[in-house]
Amino acid sequence: MWLRALVLATLAAFTAWGHPSSPPVVDTVHGKVLGKFVSLEGFTQPVAVFLGIPFAKPPLGPLRFTPPQPAEPWSFVKNATSYPPMCSQDAVAGQVLSELFTNRKENTPLKLSEDCLYLNIYTPADLTKKNRLPVMVWIHGGGLVVGAASTYDGLALAAHENVVVVTIQYRLGIWGFFSTGDEHSRGNWGHLDQLAALRWVQDNIASFGGNPGSVTIFGESAGGESVSVLVLSPLAKNLFHRAISESGVALTAVLVKKGDVKPLAEQIAIAAGCQTTTSAVMVHCLRQKTEEELLETTLKMKFFSLDLHGDPRESHPFLGTVIDGLLLPKTPEELQAERKFNTVPYMVGFNKQEFGWIIPMLMGYPLSEGKLDQKTAMSLLWKSYPLVYIAKELIPEATEKYLGGTDDPVKKKDRFLDLLADVMFSVPSVIVARHHRDAGVPTYMYEFQYRPSFSSDMKPKTVIGDHGDELFSVFGAPFLKEGASEEEIRLSKMVMKFWANFARNGNPNGEGLPRWPEYNQEEGYLQIGANTQAAQKLKDKEVAFWTTLFAKKAVEKPPQTEHIEL
């Protein structure tokens, strides 16, 4: 009898506390939103989930290529229980990336829309009480041309670590980064959307049980680069308090356009059938195009693919961040050298084989035979110019350095991929971390070296720590998908704990975790994988080699000055 009473009492408590009888409704600055409660196995307290909350006015019509405007208020209870559309992009590439990276049991097919400035919230807070939990704001990757917030389910991270997880969207591709390099279309619209989302968090997250005074921004790939840009931007001051860049920083050359951006703007205008006489003419014409017409233009531009035929110096596989004088007053290199950035604790890391499989596969590198000779490697490295910006005359030395030590064509292929990974990810990440450390701010570095069981069957078994592999651990995929080993479950628990500790305290260390040294003059960092351990001097030899090599090019080509014959 007492057992039945205990069960009934437990059920009553569960209705009141575990799964409240009515779904959550929260009052935001703009109006009320209705969410849903979702329970994760092993947790009595459900997570309140709100999907598709608008944080800005839809950037349509005359608002295309302009900074985001505040959302319009509403007077009813807005239903926030279904996924928002992802921002306009190449639907096939976007879907492929989502399927490869999602931590959900089933990938969610998403609609496309130019009206896409929405965010999702996962809060484990008891909304009847005044909680103040740390907030973690996720910025998705996808080369600034594809991607969606809803690929990443914040449920496991929120439940396991008692943090509020917010995943945000931002305009992509032409919509997000079209720049004429002048006042007609400055560019960086997608980054301004990220800032608008962070302002929304400041104004509203307390109502969801989050602490606006403890906001961590974290992102991967182009999301990591975005985090790094926000760390450098005066416009982001006080909008976040810690930052994590996974596999991407503002020195990732492919994502930051320096110099004249006009030729790329003209290429886009021509592809859209617009005149290119002046910036004003191009912008006016592109604003008149329908979303479908700009999608066709996007496909013509062949973003995310390697051009094997044309002049690599005129190829643009990505549209990127620009030095607009506002978001970025100067180049990332100059802002770092002058130590003009937001001095928040910063975690920077990358994976052991960033060019292992997913990027060369998506970009169409001709490596299906799995081997490479020196001559082909040099030619491919030149074709990779828009990714790595290695001048033609430096290619023999760079290729020899990486591939020269072996005659095995399979090893040559692997070393070629290491070269690309170092120039695009590892070396820029270490340089950013060193600058941050030198400014006297807590800095932590990691290298992720693990092959998730959720990897695509097409990925060679030898690839361990591919681009994006850490996402499964960070977002607790083993607790949402089936089939993870005990080792993988433990790894994900540890990674979530490290990331959330960092969000809580600006320091990833905590009880029962391997010690993660701060990145100081000794350059200690953490190797994360089946065996997680501290090590030193991450990629220091590679940084030295590339710094010296790139300096040669700078020395050989002094600034052009007019030469006057007397």
From Swiss-Prot:
Enzyme Commission (EC) number: 3.1.1.1, 3.1.1.13
Record's catalysed reaction(s): a carboxylic ester + H2O = an alcohol + a carboxylate + H(+); cholesteryl (9Z-octadecenoate) + H2O = cholesterol + (9Z)-octadecenoate + H(+); 2-(5Z,8Z,11Z,14Z-eicosatetraenoyl)-glycerol + H2O = glycerol + (5Z,8Z,11Z,14Z)-eicosatetraenoate + H(+); prostaglandin E2 1-glyceryl ester + H2O = prostaglandin E2 + glycerol + H(+)
UniProt keywords, alphabetically: Cytoplasm, Disulfide bond, Endoplasmic reticulum, Glycoprotein, Hydrolase, Lipid droplet, Lipid metabolism, Phosphoprotein, Serine esterase, Signal
A single GO molecular function term of this UniProt record: sterol ester esterase activity
Subcellular localization: Endoplasmic reticulum lumen; Cytoplasm; Lipid droplet
Signal sequence, start to end: 1-18
Biological processes, Gene Ontology terms: cholesterol metabolic process; negative regulation of cholesterol storage; positive regulation of cholesterol efflux; positive regulation of cholesterol metabolic process; regulation of bile acid biosynthetic process; regulation of bile acid secretion; reverse cholesterol transport
Disulfide topology: 87-116, 274-285
Glycosylated residues in this chain: 79
Modified residues (Phosphoserine): 379
Keyword Heme: no
Record-level GO cellular component terms: cytoplasm; endoplasmic reticulum lumen; lipid droplet
Assembly information from the UniProt record: Homotrimer and homohexamer. Binds to beta-glucuronidase.
PANTHER family, A to Z: CARBOXYLESTERASE (PTHR11559)
Summary of the function given for this chain in its UniProt record: Involved in the detoxification of xenobiotics and in the activation of ester and amide prodrugs. Hydrolyzes aromatic and aliphatic esters, but has no catalytic activity toward amides or a fatty acyl-CoA ester. Displays fatty acid ethyl ester synthase activity, catalyzing the ethyl esterification of oleic acid to ethyloleate. Converts monoacylglycerides to free fatty acids and glycerol. Hydrolyzes of 2-arachidonoylglycerol and prostaglandins.
Family: Belongs to the type-B carboxylesterase/lipase family.
Protein name: Liver carboxylesterase 1
